[in-house]
């Protein structure tokens, strides 16, 4: 059995360890000693010719390939006239063999002042050690950065018959606050973020192959809209006006559809002044796509293709493990109306019910409701509490009540219902889509109804955006819209259980 602890449990061993401040002071003194010796501990550049992964994959025993690598010292064994150390670069780690007779006395003496965490440049040639490890025989060594703060390196010891890991950088809160250290010492964290970039690239290429245009829309907006959420506010001094950080980019993208583009998309940073938990960060990333002359049924098929294609390109597999469940993203996905889903999981029929009847249903289910919310929010609360967590395999939830979706087109055959779907995976929403409402008269009525909900105290109800209404009064073609939460999709495809594990620098409480 192996235990993991950030501090030694043996008090004698702990007392023999130099304090963090002592280690920093020693490194600062070493820095000054290097400077006094005529060595610049922070030179401008180094000519790198190879990365560790390339060397390890392309190594040939007899070649003695000349190489120049740079990286951070992660392990070090200082001996008499020859030493070994490992450097870590962006691609991995490789061992360096350093011999005094080869690099010279000055360079070897400098090496004796180096610590784990220092960044060095090495030139030499490749070889295989007697133990079979591919390594670099150093011919020159240059200090590139003197590290003044020691990085946490896991150390294993046997205590009372058990293997114990000391000094592991495993505290979640500390890892989020010091992501730069997390990336150094935890290779799997680096891989998650490399995969995040690959996911975004795969999606961008997917949209580009369809011929749709990538665009940019304002982050600072005079009126916020496109979602039910509370905004962050700021003030523009020169114009003396209040502005909002966008909660969604939907209304600006629709303006571009009015302007004549058949398909536009944007990878956007959005901001919502709401709570923080495993699935929510106030600043998050989503991609929104709008395609003219399409509807939500067409968009469901596209989403299946998008997620399957992205998973295969990035993971080379159509299955992933998420929140303890093995999930298949191979199409087709299940499709279920929100009314049928609630009926299936609660035995309650919500169709054609008044607000009072919906409140009674919620009460029967043991759900306490805010008295300020209306029918749509009540249904949303019931669905979120009793249905959504149970939808593990990819499921399209369709046909929402109009009040829940003021920007969506009414269903062609069902009054009071709109053509909308959400994709739920692992019990969480991953994307949202509409057949977009393009009747300006009905759109105005919907937004004015939202304004009345705001007067009742619903802070997330939408506001009336006169410029958006003016835009669609010029005529917006039939259109399907889609919003995909990038952070949650990355969680799904990398198997992470917290949004903080897929955002480099998540928001945290003050230290």
From Swiss-Prot:
GO molecular function (one): ATP binding
UniProt KW keywords: Aminoacyl-tRNA synthetase, ATP-binding, Cytoplasm, Ligase, Magnesium, Metal-binding, Nucleotide-binding, Protein biosynthesis
The name this protein goes by in its record: Lysine--tRNA ligase
Location in or out of the cell: Cytoplasm
PANTHER family xref list: LYSINE--TRNA LIGASE, CHLOROPLASTIC_MITOCHONDRIAL, LYSYL-TRNA SYNTHETASE
GO CC term, one of those recorded: cytosol
InterPro entries per record: Aa-tRNA-synt_II, aa-tRNA-synth_II, aa-tRNA-synth_II/BPL/LPL, Lys-tRNA-ligase_II, Lys-tRNA-ligase_II_N, Lys-tRNA-synth_II_C, NA-bd_OB-fold, NA-bd_OB_tRNA
Binding site for Mg(2+) 2: 429
Catalytic reaction annotation: tRNA(Lys) + L-lysine + ATP = L-lysyl-tRNA(Lys) + AMP + diphosphate
Region (Disordered): 1-20
Keyword Nucleotide-binding: yes
Gene: lysS
Enzyme Commission number(s) of this protein: 6.1.1.6
Pfam families: tRNA-synt_2, tRNA_anti-codon
Co-factor requirement: Mg(2+)
Gene3D superfamilies named among the record's database cross-references: Bira Bifunctional Protein, Domain 2, Nucleic acid-binding proteins
Similarity remark: Belongs to the class-II aminoacyl-tRNA synthetase family.
Source domain of life: Bacteria
Quaternary structure and interacting proteins, as annotated: Homodimer.
Top EC category: ligase
Cofactor remark: Binds 3 Mg(2+) ions per subunit.
Gene Ontology biological-process entries: lysyl-tRNA aminoacylation
HAMAP family from the UniProt entry: Lys_tRNA_synth_class2 (MF_00252)
Positions annotated to bind Mg(2+) 1: 422, 429
